[in-house]
Amino acid sequence: METTRRTLLRNAGVVAAAGSMLFQASAAGQGTGSSAPAPATTGKDGAAGLRSQAWCMLRTPQGDSLGLRRENRVLDVGKAGKALKVQVPASTDELLEGKGTAGLQKVLAAPASSVKAALVAVEDARFGPCVTRPQKIIMLGFNYRRHAEETHTPFPKAPVLFNKYNNALCGHEGVIHLPTRAAKKFDYEVELQVIMGKTARDVSETDALGYVFGYATGNDFSARDLQYRDGKGASQFMIGKTCDGFLPIGPWLVGADLVGDPQKLKVETRVNGETRQSSNTDDMIFTCAQIIAYASSLFTLYPGDVISTGTPEGVILGKPEAQQVWLKPGDRIECSVEKCGELRFTLA
């Protein structure tokens, strides 16, 4: 599988011209400036490889399909594969597993005219979560200094890990149906998502980022009264954070070569247009590389596994109790991570 993936990366130079069109700041519907993903670059192997592209999951009348960003449009890879009569990855998960790579090469190398019908404008596209069936969704608690301070939590001596399940996945422009019979205190947490690209076990901090396929914008949505139903001394991370739809992620899975240093990214949350969180990943207590090295010392990480790296200050939980106005049905949440794009969802 790894040999196939390396071959594809070497041969991917045929898409360099198309890749240079990816993710311009003027891309419709995805914001500008710091929230807009960067243009494609030439990969370390001398070609615009898979980690130098931005991928997504499209929801179409024919079913979900792998998508590839091309400036202000998205290429429906599945539809393009049918037009060229080749087998391609059906999802980002299959892309990460190395499936359908020969057909994908042909789609990427095809003249623009032959796949024109497979292009859809970004503003007309419907998106699913940018990963669909990770084996593991690993979350981090209290991993930003100022967030730990606002919640009066001592800095952890090791990464605080917990998990979510696939039922929590939610796509861009999705709707979270709040479990109001069980909880009332709903909160936002913008987080940089790390998507693994290679199997990792006991990897070093120095090598850790080489196992990453890409990054995404996500939100560790939380029900605080479930999380702390037994008091702050007995946090119930799982039940407070793993209800249906409680991990919006995407729309873009942005290749690691486009993002560069994951410790220099602006992160923001807006609620109904009001900025609530505005920070930078340089405030992390444990870096992405340290998190991967630590997690891989405990269990094997596989392609497609998600690591959500913690949230910065500005959450409702961190405010004085008299100022805590919890989220409610009808609220509109916008999250952004620099170079990864903007994620939007609504509460119902």
Which residues does each predicted region cover?
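N-terminal export signals
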Residues: 1, 7-30
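N-terminal non-catalytic cap/leader segment that marks the start of a structured domain
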Residues: 5-6, 10-12, 30-159, 332-334
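A generic local secondary-structure boundary/capping motif
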Residues: 43-47, 56, 127-129, 149-152, ...
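Structural signature of FAD isoalloxazine-binding scaffolds in flavoprotein oxidoreductases
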Residues: 69, 155-172, 188, 329-338
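Residue-level recognition of short, solvent-exposed, well-ordered loop/turn junctions
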Residues: 132, 139, 187-189, 302, ...
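Non-heme Fe(II) oxygenase catalytic core, chiefly the N-lobe of the double-stranded beta-helix
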Residues: 167, 171-226, 230
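Catalytic-pocket segment enriched in acidic/His residues
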Residues: 177, 222-348
